Amino acid sequence: MSDSTKASLSSANMGNIHIDPTGFVKLGAQLPTLANILAQAIDELGLTLSAQQQRSLLLYLDQLLLWNKAYNLTAITDPVEALIKHVIDCLAIITHLPSGSLLDIGTGAGLPAVIIAICQPERSCTALDSNQKKIRFIKQVSSELGLSNMQPIASRIEAHEASYDVITSRAFASLIDFVAVAEPRLADNGYLCAMKGKAPSEEELDALSNDWQFKTIKLNVPRLHDSRHLIELSYKNV
């Protein structure tokens, strides 16, 4: 690492954005680099996020890596890779999400729920997972970031009774499985939004009930070369 990069540890400047390193534990000397990568991705995705929101995203990443061993949150331990594959990957869906209350099923470490809550403070977000330790982490990081719009709940989806306008998930390999467990919790005129790698096959889509209409959105995730798609499903009368 160059001396100039080391010297910039005291502040990460992204145009007019200043990231104070106070409170960061794991990102350390990489904070300026990570801040610049994040700022560039936000610009490429057409998002408008304040300096505080950008700081919150980086603090979330810092906490994710700090508590990873204790809570078994992610297999990715490199900060740059985690920023791209977790934070920026989730940022890519923000502009495509319908409005309204949101439930994230199988949220794990809070992805995409925490990212959405940071970016859209006006939206009520619920993070649902049966893993108590991961929900404990989300409660902790939500408190530290002041996310009053975030409600972490430790429960299986089958035992959860509320309904939501938007239901998201990164956790399901099968689109059919996601629809099956999410549909009972979907509000009238609501939307299911599944984050996927490859676009679903014709066989997968044909297996859905004829009651559903769908839209496949190809996502361009900055610095990520893997395929990413958002599958939006709604009832045909929506």
Curated annotation (Swiss-Prot):
UniProt-listed Pfam families: GidB
Record localization: Cytoplasm
SUPFAM superfamilies found in the cross-reference section: S-adenosyl-L-methionine-dependent methyltransferases (SSF53335)
Record's GO cellular component terms: cytosol
EC number: 2.1.1.170
Tree of life domain: Bacteria
Stored InterPro entries: rRNA_ssu_MeTfrase_G (IPR003682), SAM-dependent_MTases_sf (IPR029063)
A GO molecular-function annotation: rRNA (guanine-N7-)-methyltransferase activity
Binding site for S-adenosyl-L-methionine: 106, 111, 157-158, 170
Keyword Ligase part of the UniProt annotation: no
Keywords assigned: Cytoplasm, Methyltransferase, rRNA processing, S-adenosyl-L-methionine, Transferase
Record field: catalytic activity: guanosine(527) in 16S rRNA + S-adenosyl-L-methionine = N(7)-methylguanosine(527) in 16S rRNA + S-adenosyl-L-homocysteine
Task of the protein: Specifically methylates the N7 position of guanine in position 527 of 16S rRNA.
UniProt record similarity statement: Belongs to the methyltransferase superfamily. RNA methyltransferase RsmG family.
Protein name: Ribosomal RNA small subunit methyltransferase G
